[in-house]
Amino acid sequence: TGNYVVDRFLGLASFNPLYFNDGTPNPETCLPICRPDQLAEVKEANDIAGYVTETASKETGLAVGTPVIVGTDDSGAEAISTGVVAPGKMMIQFGSSIYMILGTKELVDDERLWREEFIVPGLCDISAGTNAAGSLTKWYRNTIFPDALELEQNGGPDAYITMMQDLDKIPVGSDGLITLPYFAGERTPINDPLARGILFGLTLAHTRQHMYRSALESVAYSVNQQLKIMLEHDVPIDQIFAVGGGCLLYTSPS
């Protein structure tokens, strides 16, 4: 289209604090980063962003003048697809990171979490995220369980299935082994890109299965921490939709 456009949800959530709540650029917060006129124009997700240009038509085969809607980001779209279209509906997205979106009637004031007007008209949301989830399990696969990966590559079972073996024989708490999952900084509630992962309580009795279970537990504790903060605001959570590759894990770590 030749137009630089972002939907309100993504603009206010991912580019905070560069925009005011009405979608106009904030000159003060833009100052150290860019000029306000360099920011994308904020529109609603179902607005028309523009129309297919001649150049785009030649590259894509789409007819010149075809309207193109603004759309939204992957997590917002997936939340709607799962059913987050009313207050009390919540999505937990299990991918490289974990992202949670809870529909609410009103905006919640809590600096620990993200909150904005949602894509669905008249609906607000609280959102939160854990930076290392699937990326943490992948790190364990590649670094701590390379034999499981090699077995898979030679026609054996999926490496993650091999890694889950015997985890259910380890008690909750991984025999005192605790992980902080901040291997890639952390989003909410600490919002600190410099946070780092920690594994403490190691003894000679611990195995790599203990380490992996502790990592899975740490992600579960992180999700629980976010949920507890949300519930501090007396917002209902009536239904939770779980999506993403993390749903394929067949052993619960807690």
Place the predicted regions along the sequence by residue.
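Amphipathic, well-packed alpha-helical segments that form the structural scaffold of globular domains
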Residues: 53-57, 141, 145, 200, ...
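Beta-strand segments within the central parallel beta-sheet cores of soluble alpha/beta enzyme folds
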Residues: 36-45, 67-70, 91-94, 152-157, ...
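Glycine/charged-rich beta-loop-alpha catalytic/anionic-binding loops adjacent to active sites
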Residues: 56-66, 116-122, 202-208
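Catalytic phosphate/nucleotide-handling subdomain of diverse soluble enzymes
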Residues: 76-138, 142-143, 147, 232-252
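Gly/Ser/Thr-rich active-site cleft segment
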Residues: 1-73, 181-184, 212, 216
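Acidic-glycine-rich active-site phosphate/pyrophosphate-binding loop
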Residues: 46-59, 105-115, 190-199, 248-252
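A short helix-loop
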Residues: 1-2, 26-37, 57-58, 103-188
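Activation-segment/catalytic-loop signature of the eukaryotic protein kinase fold
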Residues: 176-252
